[in-house]
């Protein structure tokens, strides 16, 4: 043990730790989890934090705050790594390397519809639906681009099941040759299944297998004089070969992930290049939150690299064994490479190797990954230097003593008082934090009363923030002096004092650059020059709050109008309304539906069906 002053209780605990695999949680005096780790031998690993040799910056800072330690013994290292990954995601401890929440990374989902599966973008914290998932992808745009490619080549439907069931004729997707209209049985379940299987192989990077099968099918179609089907297959082959050329096929088979990591003061970047069947299928960047900002010792930089790699393994591979490749190539040696190989191989059900300093074609893959890593790091630094300079400009403008760590902005949206919604967006030193955005459905006020709407939203929000001890440094209101005064009264009544309250009024012309700023703390109003960095930051936050509010308002308004339209028809209550919408997918399709189709809806007799039909066809 070192000369740290350990409590008698903690010292005794360290002597009684088991020499088995498991995870450990280090807590401060308030019971907050500071760090979660895994170990093949809990006794050796946990005691190592308190040895004289462990002098790293991070370790010293961590150990100085430890009040107690909790452990969970597991049956294997694999189980320990899985449990560690899940706990880090759930608890987000201060001293762990934290990758962004899963919600931030979108997936492609193929549903498990028995006959005609649907392809869609999926991103949610909720329990995922059954079916096949592919990803994660670097962003929504990448997912949408891939889905469009799959629709063009394999013609997989992307419509909701409720819409699919209600179709009586093909939709626009069929007309533009992105769907085979399974809704009206223009394709058999057997042939559609072949297309789905090809799409899955495509997403797995198995293009050559698809090409071989398509060529064989085309040959059979020609021999059977089915020239129309042969032409379709020919076009699929042509499009797939074009994609192969774009992806850069190399003379090497097998699957690999190439992972290049760079650790900088304050952040780390992970570049993951996905190679499937010898093709560069994808390249994406991850920017985990690192547990401390200053790396003043080589040991700390190396240990953080190791921790970053292990965190990525837990985040990226352990949720689904299908993503684990034959080979993982890295740009730095791994301390526990054999242990990780064993864990990944067990999870996968077959061998997975980790390789450092590759040669030949594999070295070209690593060069590709490192080049992309450098570009990603440069873009990140450029973006965040801009954000940092804007934050500094706002700090100087507001004459604040401390740095701005967190800002929140509120906006109200409605259409002549209908379906009023308030939005709250959150920015920190990294920029927008979409996972912390909140929307508020405003009820019980006079329609169009923006003051009452703002009062209700801020009151609800700040009661939660006070309980969570997560108050912003700067509170921005998209509105004039009246709304800002209301908010000032609300936060004062809640006992909140140490917050800078700022109003952003649109000005008489409502043009960008002419905003009037209302600084409540100093009781002054002013306009900033158009090239002001502080103004650009405020405009960004204000525009994001407005976008989020108006999107939520439109959804609520559409839902309200659908409900009110149907409920105005005598005999249509909540259950029948839901049955109609489930059958037809929306008002537009219901309005187009013939009388005999409406009669088929459960709970709708002929008389009521006629009344509904006449409502849309007066």
From Swiss-Prot:
PROSITE patterns: GIY_YIG, UVR, UVRC. Pfam families: GIY-YIG (PF01541), HHH_5 (PF14520), UVR (PF02151), UvrC_RNaseH (PF22920), UvrC_RNaseH_dom (PF08459). Its main location: cytoplasm. GO terms for cellular component: cytoplasm; excinuclease repair complex. It comes from the Bacteria. One of its GO terms (biological process) is nucleotide-excision repair. It is found in: Cytoplasm. Residues 208-243 form the UVR domain. GO terms for molecular function: DNA binding; excinuclease ABC activity. Residues 19-97 form the GIY-YIG domain. SMART domains: GIYc (SM00465), HhH1 (SM00278). SUPFAM superfamilies: C-terminal UvrC-binding domain of UvrB (SSF46600), GIY-YIG endonuclease (SSF82771), RuvA domain 2-like (SSF47781). Disulfide bonds: none annotated. Keywords: Cytoplasm, DNA damage, DNA excision, DNA repair, Excision nuclease, SOS response. InterPro entries: GIY-YIG_endonuc, GIY-YIG_endonuc_sf, GIY-YIG_UvrC_Cho, Hlx-hairpin-Hlx_DNA-bd_motif, RuvA_2-like, UVR_dom, UVR_dom_sf, UvrABC_protein_C. Interacts with UvrB in an incision complex. The UvrABC repair system catalyzes the recognition and processing of DNA lesions. UvrC both incises the 5' and 3' sides of the lesion. The N-terminal half is responsible for the 3' incision and the C-terminal half is responsible for the 5' incision. HAMAP family: UvrC. Belongs to the UvrC family. This is UvrABC system protein C. The gene is uvrC.
